Structures are given as structure tokens and as C-alpha cells.
Amino acid sequence: MRAILFDTETSAKENGEVIELSYCDVYCDGVDEFSGPNPISRGTITTLRFKPKGGISFGACAVHHILPADLDDAPPFDLELLPPADIYVGHNIDFDLKFFPNRTPVRTIDTLA
């Protein structure tokens, strides 16, 4: 089983664009806790930044501290960059997943709940 732990930062709270995507793969061999050991391995942590088509709101900058100048050399956002997974884990995950309509997870875990 493959889980992706991920988070996005956006250019605005409403109608924003993804300006940062961070994720980490977590793999499980599929053995559950009642059947025996459940080895879990962690993959690489990846952080990618993107230049928005519009600007970055002051409120968004205050939250994530990413300034427009930090994105001058960044490529545009590509929704294909979030890897496919069996489970997606994130904080306020419904907000983050709306930027990746091509990813339909089997399950999600929201740390906001």
C-alpha cells in the first residue's frame, strides 16, 4: 500500500493557485496489526515551488512566508506532480485535493478532523 503525506501552499485562500507542494511517500507491506509486524518505510520528502499566474495575497504571504520574489525562477504549476496513491494524508485535505482533480484516492486521512 502506498500513502502520500502532502501539503500545499497557495497564493490566496479563495481562488488561489498552488505555489508550493510538499509530499512524502510512505509504504506499508500490507500486513495488518493483528496478523503480525507491519513494517513501514518512508520515501523521499519532495518540495516543489511554482510561479502563480496571478499575484500572492498579503494574507497568504503572512501564513506561509513565501514571497513573490521567491518564485521568480519557479515553473508554472503542473497538477500531474502529485503521485498516485492508495491513501492521501493531509491537513484540511479536501482543500488540497481540489487542486488535483486527476487524483481520486481510495481513502483520505485528514489531520484537521
Regions found by a protein language model. Name each.
Residues 1-111:
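Conserved non-catalytic scaffold segment of RNase H-like nuclease domains
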